């Protein structure tokens, strides 16, 4: 199942730039698409939705179970004993599976080619380091959307000096290459199948 659009097309169509609080791309291209398919094709009493939450993501399960009701939701990596990503990688090595490339490069999630509007500075720094052409392509799209909307919006936030303001990917790149301090302490968590309260 596929919508046929990429995240940037969704942002242009909805006239809104996804960010750490509102992930239109995940909502439209993942959650709503799957939800519509489940509604059409699956009996709730005979269908279980399996999610790949690991032991570090247990807090996401309650929201996910509420969102995906009336289907039963399971996250096998949270079941006894819970497994975190290191446990999963160890198990993969034991059975001869190769570690997903993005994990091997330090990304916390192996999705969307390392790009995620819900991610933080840490993930974007990794994207710039390992895939600079991909980072630059997203920076161009962000700038195009800013012009299209006529607004000072950005995926990231600058929290320096106690003030919060938009931090474009172009400016983030400049700061990263100048070795200026970035906010790389909050991780780069994914929430694709765990909806947050949205304002868009």
How would you describe each model-predicted region?
Residues 1-200:
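Nucleotide-activated chemistry modules centered on ATP-dependent adenylation/adenylyltransferase
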